[in-house]
Amino acid sequence: MHNKRYSMIVIALAAVAAMIVATQQPIAAQAPQGGGQKGGGAKGGGFGGGAAKGGAAKGVPAAPLPTQPTAVALPTLSAKITGPGAIYDSAVSQWPGRDVKFYKYDTDEYFVSGTANGKPYKTRLVIRRPADNARFSGLVLSEAMHPAGNAHAFEYTSVYLMSSGHIAAEILTGTSAVPLAANKERYADLTLSNDQTNEILAQVGALIRSKTGPLADVTVRKQVLFGTSASSAILTNYLPAHMVYRTPEMQHIYDGFMPTSNGSVIMAVDVPLIQVPTQHEQENIATNRQDGDAAGDQYRNYEFAGMGHLDSRNNGPRLPQSACVNPLSNYPLEAYMSVALYHLLRWVDQGIVPPRADRILIDRNRNNDGSLMALDEHGNAKGGIRNPYVDMPVAKYTARNTAAPTNGNALLCGLSVYTTAIPKAELKKMYGSKSNYVKKVDARLKELEKAGWSLPVYHDLILADAKAVDF
């Protein structure tokens, strides 16, 4: 009964999160803010989860922002939480065989208490860090936990993140229903509300950088905030607060931002921001904001051909094949989200300006796959950042899978990509032999790695997909 109730809560929250994203409404707006470059409302975006015009969600009182840069109060950090019972695991979808144990990472949980919007709060903070401090890179990837209870920023970059020695921080900013349903005794005292979100993100982010926080034994050089889908709405809603909230030393709390699975037009900020719309966001034209390098407009838009709104490759615990009618895509979303994170971290930490990329081409013809994308002869997107899955294709990648008639999941299937295999006879005409195909993929990977569009840490993992193709 407990597990059934927990599953129902997760499904309900996921549905709420999807509705928020689909309608471009803010999850936790505390002050009027715009999604546009000049502070206007969000435009376009499909399922991107950007800020909607008007700021505060109906019924949620806005907390007015300071008019000048203001230091936030540091909240109180608990000792490491070790019980009762097991920690709620928000990162169940890591690359098989490449989890925290493989990379010798520790997962530490804390409770954080403070005051936000005039009310006390107590929330959860999870730190995933190298067991050996000497491996820490000095860089922290922080995220607001997705409303459905997922640490997607960590999951979607975990191989790159852990192989590089970065630390991942996960901050609970909204409802505690998911961890509470998983372990009532452990999480019974958590108390927070959506109208406290921005201040919680600021206060806990400042705590992470401080010498009284969970990383007091190491030196944090830079910290970025990542969001995907509904949690990217949390991120974009935070941006006006970013412009005024500071650490007690009056430094930036977050040095860069990465909203993903998000196609809205996002306001300009004073630190680098890389946005990653997916093929789902091309059902409506994704943001037309242009890349920029100048101070106050450090922006990149990275659109990866073949990428879906949701990872369906390593998401078996949440989205098994049996839930959807069509074959789930094996496209390695993580490998390419990590490319964007790699460039963002170099930008904020070393000042290395990232390359600009072509956008996915648009023909406004919905009679092909229902999107506005221009498609090649195999049915895959033209333009965008390329990869072997679309350059040496063995399948067509189409957004919006269909839920299975029995025990299906309409929400997650609809947010995933499915594949249609290219017939083996056609593959033989295209590549001649399997060995020749593998050589082509290997050569293409090396080209992309040299150009900065694929990371060497994923080379063998991607090449293994090519070696598994049979024709």
Language-model features: where?
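Signal peptide processing junction and immediate N-terminal pro/mature segment
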Residues: I20-Q33
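Hydrophobic transmembrane signal anchors and adjacent membrane-proximal interface regions, especially
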Residues: M8-I11, I27-A29, V159-M162
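C-terminal His-loop and adjacent cap/lid subdomain of alpha/beta-hydrolase
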Residues: A31-F471
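N-terminal secretory signal peptides that target proteins for export/translocation
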Residues: M1-Y6
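Bacterial N-terminal signal peptides
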Residues: V10-A22
